[in-house]
Amino acid sequence: MNNELYLSFKITNWCNLHCDHCCERSNKHNEPKFLSLEKLDKYLSESKTLPIIPNQLISFSGGETFAPYMFNQPNYIPVALDLAYSYGYIPTIKTNGTWGDNDLLRIKILNDIASRAHKYGKLVTLDISVDEFHNNESGVMKIISNTLTNFDLCYAIRICLVGFNTPGSANALNSSQQKLQTLGFEIDKTYSGDWMICAPNQSCGIYMCNDYATPIYNIGRAKQTKTYTSTGNPNGNDGANCLQLDNNDYAILNYTYREPIKNRPLNKVLESLMEKVH
């Protein structure tokens, strides 16, 4: 195990979608149980004592990560971002982006996360799934258009459109690219599979990227006995390690090795997981 570690917090299994390929067993029939903010605070605090110092880039995922807004908990994500920033981390929020079609919800979410980014002087990133599995192009276009045409949002939010290494994902990304061009956004194709989309004369932008360097394996919903359906490397560079802490009091290393936390210190949990690797 090398010395690069990324932290990820899975805040819920609830999702408004039920995608056939979902590796997290997420759907709208799951109980909307959220990782408590008290536990998030505890994990972030203890992360500073881990034997491997985590990268400052962390992620929040689900289910649908913005689900708290749909269950009358509009302060959840802003407080989670406050905690992440206060411990010196830079957050990425993974989402399916379908909330972009709800005008009131879209404006609320974008303003909330932008206000936190401005407060701490660091960007917040949205990772939005754009592939053959998510019918979300309309909502995604509205999120992008709002972000890049609003000064406060443009300088606070970075958006990554994330796809798989499949022809369907390539088609979805190309379709998004063409629609963005019709909206008047400049696109600089810097290297194969990745585009950076910038509002004219603005320094902030959007990255369209293929998130996985390898093809998808074992497409299909995860089995109850299998934590994760592998889709390639974990977050970060090749060989990096990802420690995910979820809403069911489990720690998962590299989407493979699973360990109950059971009120143990996080450094002890990571030690147990590292023993499983070896």
Language-model-derived ranges and their functions:
Residues 1, 85, 120, 153, ...:
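Solvent-exposed loop and beta-edge segments used for protein-protein assembly and interaction
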Residues 1-21, 55-60, 241-249:
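N-terminal pre-triad scaffold of radical SAM enzymes
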Residues 6-12, 24-174:
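Conserved glycine-rich "GG(E/T)P / GGGxP" loop and the immediately following alpha-helix
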Residues 111, 174-177, 181, 267-275:
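Generic detector of well-ordered alpha-helical segments enriched in charged/polar residues
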Residues 158-160, 172-202:
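Eukaryotic C-terminal
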Residues 190-278:
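Accessory C-terminal segments flanking Radical SAM cores
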